[in-house]
UniProtKB/Swiss-Prot annotation:
Assigned GO CC terms: helical viral capsid; host cell; host cell nucleus; ribonucleoprotein complex; viral nucleocapsid
Keyword RNA-binding: yes
Marked site positions, Cleavage: 7-8, 61-62
Keyword check for RNA-binding: yes
Originating gene: NP
Organism placement in taxonomy: Viruses, Riboviria, Orthornavirae, Negarnaviricota, Polyploviricotina
Protein name as catalogued: Nucleoprotein
Family affiliation: Belongs to the influenza viruses nucleoprotein family.
Length: 560
């Protein structure tokens, strides 16, 4: 089936009947956007750790390796090569799975199945652990499981007259075969590609699920959700993962470590554990954007026997990050099924930026399709998909609405569930829909917190974490933050705490008319060279916060 046929899928609310094909013309009206070459990013940005900020090594005459920074053009070329190779790997896996129809290859769930299989196949530590545990289980008389294999649920398309639907099939692969195929395709170990996929899964989790249980477990208020980006990222995502993690996520990791150290006083005598703990705190310090926040982390780093006082300090730090936001990298991460289409989409540049025009142009050209679960509304599902791709779970909904020309709703108002279909819901004849929300305007992504305060808040999420660098007020619930400020500042670090609370109060006292990202504009999606900047229109009737009153499933309740 051609790409144009995908537009024919009816995008209504699913009930038990499969979707019917109806003649559609949206493919004809969608403009073909050719990606541009962006102006080189500033030197300031190239210092941050991310998949796009890599270095190459060259040999000196005496044979010693030195690090040479890549130019912006070299970076974009290497990123282009990475995403194209990921797409090639996806096509090879789909051939092995016997799924060759365009509709099957455009399906988000099939892309996720391949991504999960790849991550499982390349996680040698986990495989080793599973084998050892299974060996113990077998001795106790339990069933033997072959951990050299991994698999997933794919969806095969079935045509019935004018109706098309999808049926689930289980397919397994040898881990070693998958790993070899991936390394051969990438021409290396392909760690940057694996990290890219992990970030995509994390962004989708941030959008689809709440993390109130994870927050409460370490004594943090669920209203700090906007600081909790990247909370489901595995440790093996390394510095790339740290760059996209929110401050609250790192605070959570540190508090859990302190909890373990309090239960086992010998833990931090182990050099490996101590190094891991110090690394978390240093990453946290690097995230902080205010000297008062850094001073509080220094206080915790200097503690010989971390305990309750340190947990209180870190809790205050997390609260301060709602007002003075840390630096969180934002990236566009698309399903690898979209990267597989790059050769067919007329995407003829050999440069690609995950934070600029190219990624947004590719998103607009793509025709991704998703399985609809029982009760899902296709338009609402499209909103979830858009926010997942752009890592916009904690972005101001008014900004997203302005960029897409679609009124975005808070999570509690969306009639749809996450993209992962649990085993109990996998049935014959599942309907699907095109993810139809596209960008009408674009703006570069940001890694800054945009630290000027204003706006109104809600009872759930009380602050935003900016993703797009466009001038706007930063939404913040001042009332909710003031409740957080009423805490005891006595003790060993009264001055440090007092300074931080004063900074929060001073920031809160600013006029509500102050904007962040002064002078930054948006551009029409056809304006690849930023010729005509447009001021973003902020519609006051749309709520600021996606998780304002949350009714989403909790990530901890998932049954994979």
């Amino acid at each position: 089936m051609s790409n144009m046929d995908i537009d024919s899928i009816n995008t209504g609310t699913i009930d038990k009947t499969p979707e019917e094909l109806t003649p559609g013309t949206s493919g004809a009206t969608r403009p073909i956007i050719k990606p541009a070459t962006l102006a080189p990013p500033s030197n300031k940005r190239t210092r941050n750790p991310s998949p796009e900020r890599t270095t190459t090594s060259s040999e000196t005459d005496i044979g010693r390796k030195i690090q040479k920074k890549q130019t912006p053009t070299e970076i974009k070329k290497s990123v282009y090569k990475m995403v194209v190779k990921l797409g090639e790997f996806y096509n090879q896996m789909m051939v092995k799975a016997g799924l060759n129809d365009d509709m099957e290859r455009n399906l988000i769930q099939n892309a996720q199945a391949v991504e999960r299989i790849l991550l499982a196949a390349t996680d040698d530590k986990k495989t080793e652990y599973q084998k050892k545990r299974n060996a113990r289980d077998v001795k106790e008389g339990k069933e033997e499981i072959d951990h050299n294999k991994t698999g997933g649920t794919f969806y095969k398309m079935v045509r019935d007259d004018k109706t098309i639907y999808f049926s689930p099939i289980k397919i397994t692969f040898l881990k070693e075969e998958v790993k070899t195929m991936y390394k051969t395709t990438m021409g290396s170990d392909g760690f940057s590609g694996l990290n890219h996929i992990m970030i995509g899964h994390s962004q989708m989790n941030d959008v689809c699920f709440q993390r109130s249980k994870g927050l409460k477990r370490v004594g943090l208020d669920p209203s700090l959700i906007s600081t909790f980006a990247g909370s489901t990222l595995p440790r093996r995502s390394g510095t790339t993962g740290v760059a996209i993690k929110g401050g609250g996520t790192l605070v959570d990791e540190a508090i859990r470590f302190i909890g373990r150290a309090m239960a086992d006083r010998g833990l931090l005598r182990d050099i490996k554990a101590k190094t891991a703990y110090e690394k978390i705190l240093l990453n946290l310090k690097n995230k902080c954007s205010a000297p008062q926040q850094k001073a509080l982390v220094d206080q915790v780093i200097g503690s010989r026997n971390p305990g309750i006082a340190d947990i209180e300090d870190l809790t205050l730090l997390a609260r301060s990050m709602v007002v003075v936001r840390p630096s969180v990298a934002s990236k566009v991460v698309l399903p690898i099924s979209i990267y597989a289409k790059i050769p067919q989409l007329g995407f003829n540049t050999e440069e690609y930026s995950m934070v600029g025009y190219e990624a947004m142009a590719l998103y607009n050209m793509a025709t991704p399709v998703s399985i609809l679960r029982m009760g899902d509304d296709a338009k609402d599902k499209s909103q979830l998909f858009f926010m997942s791709c752009f890592g916009a779970a904690y972005e101001d909904l008014r900004v997203l609405s302005a960029l897409t020309g679609t009124e975005f709703k808070p999570r509690s108002a969306l009639k749809c569930k996450g993209f992962h279909v649990p085993a109990k819901e996998q049935v014959e004849g599942m309907g699907a829909a095109l993810m139809s929300i596209k960008l009408q305007f674009w703006a570069p992504m940001t890694r800054s917190g945009g630290n000027e305060v204003s706006g109104e808040g809600g009872s759930g999420q009380i602050s935003c974490s900016p993703v797009f660098a466009v001038e706007r007020p930063i939404a913040l619930s001042k009332q909710a933050v003031r409740r957080m400020l009423s805490m005891n500042v006595e003790g060993r670090d009264a001055d440090v705490k007092g300074n931080l609370l004063k900074m929060m109060n001073d920031s809160m006292a600013k006029k509500t008319s102050g904007n962040a990202f002064i002078g930054k504009k948006m551009f029409q999606i056809s304006d690849k060279n930023k010729v005509n900047p447009i001021e973003i229109p902020i519609k006051q009737t749309i709520p600021n916060f996606f998780f304002g009153r949350d009714t989403a499933e909790d990530y901890d309740d998932l049954d994979y």
